[in-house]
Amino acid sequence: MDPFFLNTQHVELLVSGKQSSPQDLLGIVSESLNQDRIVLFRPGAETVFVELRGKIQQAESHHSGIFSLPVMKGISPQDYRVYHQNGLLAHDPYAFPLLWGEIDSFLFHEGTHQRIYERMGAIPCEIDGVPGVRFIVWAPHAQRVSVIGDFNGWHGLVNPLHKVSDQGVWELFVPGLTAGACYKWEMVTESGQVLIKSDPYGKFFGPPPRSVSVVIDDSYEWNDSEWLEERIKKTEGPMNIYEVHVGSWQWQEGQPLNYKELADQLALYCKQMHYTHVELLPVTEHPLNESWGYQTTGYYAPTSRYGSFEDLQYFIDTMHQHGIGVILDWVPGHFPIDSFAMSGFDGTPLYEYTRNPSPLHPHWHTYTFDYAKPEVCNFLLGSALFWIDKMHVDGIRVDAVSSMLYLDYGRYAGEWVPNRYGGRENLDAIRFLQQFNTVIHEKYPGVLTFAEESTTFPKITVSVEEGGLGFDYKWNMGWMHDTLHYFEKDFPYRPYHQSDLTFPQWYAFSERFLLPFSHDEVVHGKRSLIGKMPGDAWRQFAQLRLLLGYQICQPGKKLLFMGGEFGQGREWSPGRELDWELLDISYHQGVHLCSQELNALYVQSPQLWQADHLPSSFRWVDFSDVRNGVVAYLRFADADAKKALLCVHHFGVGYFPHYLLPILPLESCDLLMNTDNTRFGGSGKGFREPEILTPEIARQEREAAGLIEADDESGPDCWGLDIELPPSATLIFSVTLQ
């Protein structure tokens, strides 16, 4: 009679690649009161040798690749190693205990495992004194899951994982493996199809098209403890973000700078230009360069295009040591259809949302995530926490939030299924975003979250406790659209579009806003910022300086995509570096210097950032001069209502040696910034000392200018400020109110 481990059914499942419980059959099994037996499976092997406590013994051969060796009772996994066909001598994977526990299962299947990145995927560890790599994956509909790699000849029958929960978690410890080992998952689906998949929880990947997962050893020694300790204090400070695509900021010898090369250069540049943060277009792994990183396949992995896992850690560490925060673009709304990654992961739409007639998103032809599954939410939440914990990022900007919030986003009637109340809101996505923000803010105070949200969905930046989504900031897409729409108009037509400047103030304090001029506005035929400006070269550059000054003065945090600060002429392309040679041209030098000094003024002026989400930080002075395109307003810090900045923007092309503004009673007025400075390439006008006029004198000036009739008694008289107003310029004054 054959021993139990040769049970025909067990062996058939093992040999056919459908065994879900290899740990029950293989490893050290008890044979009697006095004897154990080591049972091995080596498909294709004729002989197998075992080193047992220093002595080499040949295992007994059975049928179908099963080998065994009788041993004394109480043998341990450390006591023996097995010779493989490639000559490798290693401990037996099936002799070691399984570590995925009930608490892991409870938290993961509830969607609340906050350290899932230390449990799932390939985790280097030591079990019973033996080093190796523990592999864990979620594939509930697979009949068999194996880890394949160079270490087993990419043979799917050699290392099948053990199904450790009835909800589809699989585990195996492979002794002797170290960082750098390449691997993938091989799965047998319910229908018998064999799939080869990259690891959704993989921490690093080889380059496309192979896209193998790579084991990493996270042993980087950080030097940013002082930054992390002080980070929470910086959240209410100035925020001037430089948006960067790593692969096209600067090149060397025809290739993009890698993470390490970029680190010092970009950090010094940001300090020189007075940026407080960089925001990186996604550096998560992605197969397609042209997606700019927004079609992610490695949610836990930095892209290998620009260096190693440790190289990106070095980059972030270096930025912190120079006082620059790092924000990461992150895409939890959709993922690509590439068959090697998450799509149809275990033979079923495991991560995909399937309730709509077509599972593909009409805008990007990608899959959307199924937020109704706790495990999918845990996967995404774990990704965000991984980047904060292991990579020390200071903020996460969530891409395409609108597409997550609405079931009908980009879809016509009949192409989507309403929620259980008959509405269009994705209730599961809303719950996920609330969980995302709640966990991050509780676990990592000082880390900021940003929503790129283009609709009027309410309470984006209201706390979860008050019924909001809980983001720290929302991108003000309406302000960006209206502002650029106005600037693109030729000067004679601007008076008909004055509302583009004034309307955004009606909702400017309904959320905590960030004002972006992002990468999306300088691609796909939209033209660069300088290319949007009407007129000849002088007027274009004057308008760009005016635009940058306007952004700095408006209430809200700031973001500018790389190249905008020096007037990049061509549209951005991810396949080439910025046109840095333009800085040899005076116009570009001028706008670059202007941007630098505007940034410096911003970070040094609490009136521009200290209370920029409160209505009390902004007060109109005048927006009635539609014909000449002049608007003026005051900006306040919450500490001193008498100290303010007066911001004056002239969107026209005329020059006014004497321009009279109605103003509150002033004690003093001093010019701080003039974008028409000759150092910036301007005409040098606007530097005459402003004159503060009493109501009586101001009225006389208005009568003389024909602004009011002599017998006009409508409304009270107000003080006036007589300034020299240059063409197409921003003027910023420091004023003290009476």
From Swiss-Prot:
Coiled coil: none annotated. The active site is at D399 (nucleophile), E452 (proton donor). Its EC number is 2.4.1.18. Pathway: Glycan biosynthesis; glycogen biosynthesis. Keywords: Carbohydrate metabolism, Glycogen biosynthesis, Glycogen metabolism, Glycosyltransferase, Transferase. It comes from the Bacteria. One of its GO terms (cellular component) is cytosol. SMART domains: Aamy. GO terms for molecular function: 1,4-alpha-glucan branching enzyme activity; cation binding; hydrolase activity, hydrolyzing O-glycosyl compounds. It catalyses: Transfers a segment of a (1->4)-alpha-D-glucan chain to a primary hydroxy group in a similar glucan chain. InterPro entries: A-amylase/branching_C, Branching_enzy, GlgB, GlgB_N_E_set_prok, Glyco_hydro_13_cat_dom, Glyco_hydro_13_N, Glyco_hydro_b, Glycoside_hydrolase_SF. GO terms for biological process: glycogen biosynthetic process. CDD domains: AmyAc_Glg_BE, E_set_GBE_prok_N. Gene3D superfamilies: Glycosidases (3.20.20.80), Golgi alpha-mannosidase II (2.60.40.1180), Immunoglobulins (2.60.40.10). It is an enzyme of class 2 (transferase). PANTHER family: 1,4-ALPHA-GLUCAN-BRANCHING ENZYME (PTHR43651:SF3). Belongs to the glycosyl hydrolase 13 family. GlgB subfamily. Monomer. NCBIfam families: branching_enzym, PRK05402.1, PRK12313.1. HAMAP family: GlgB. Catalyzes the formation of the alpha-1,6-glucosidic linkages in glycogen by scission of a 1,4-alpha-linked oligosaccharide from growing alpha-1,4-glucan chains and the subsequent attachment of the oligosaccharide to the alpha-1,6 position. This is 1,4-alpha-glucan branching enzyme GlgB. It comes from Chlamydia trachomatis serovar L2 (strain ATCC VR-902B / DSM 19102 / 434/Bu). The lineage of its organism: Bacteria, Pseudomonadati, Chlamydiota, Chlamydiia, Chlamydiales.
